[in-house]
Amino acid sequence: MDLNRRNVLQASLLLPALAVSAGRQARAQGLTGPAYEVTPWSGPLSSLGLLDTTGKTWQWPDLQGRAVMLNFWASWCEPCRAEMPTLQQVADLYGADKLLVLAINFKEPAARALQFAKTTGLKLPVLLDTTGRAAGQWGVKVFPTTLMLDNRGQARHRIKGEVDWTSNAPGKLIEGLFQA
């Protein structure tokens, strides 16, 4: 093989790796668009009936009169772990009387979900979807996924992927939940 062909072959093998690396770096620096997808969500609102790590069973009446974010996550999911601090920040900012953020752990033992919450300082209620039933009922296939309900209990948005909930666009989505 001549030198020219070898150089072209090496370059063609190297370019995809460089493109992936550059894309990751640009995303980390905030130079690309969001790593999430927002779609309208109209329900249906399946039964909730999930236990949290304290033993409380959560039902729809527990959520009435406030906006709600149902965040499906798992401790093995890197984007889930990355967005969790910003979920805690918006929950702290608005308070549970106005915005209730429920972190719904997907198919992990309660001890693992509780350990994650303790080591990360997470104070959100952590609900346990140990069988994946709730995720299945609501069509959750990507982690993290957040389902948003307005303060009248109406389903509004489905967000797939990692979100910085303290940034402008997600903040507008949250504010829109109080306008109902």
Residue ranges of model-derived segments:
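Short, internal strand/loop/helix patches
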Residues: 102, 114-152
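Short active-site neighborhood of thiol/selenol oxidoreductases, capturing the structured segment around
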Residues: 61-76
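Sec/Tat signal peptide C-region and signal peptidase I cleavage site
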Residues: 24-27
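Thiol-/selenol-based redox modules, centered on thioredoxin-like
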Residues: 151-180
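Conserved redox-active cysteine motifs that mediate thiol-disulfide chemistry
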Residues: 72-89
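Conserved helix-turn-beta segment immediately C-terminal to the redox Cys motif
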Residues: 84-103
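N-terminal secretory signal peptides and thylakoid transit peptides that target proteins
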Residues: 1-16
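N-terminal "domain-start" segment that seeds a small globular fold
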Residues: 29-60
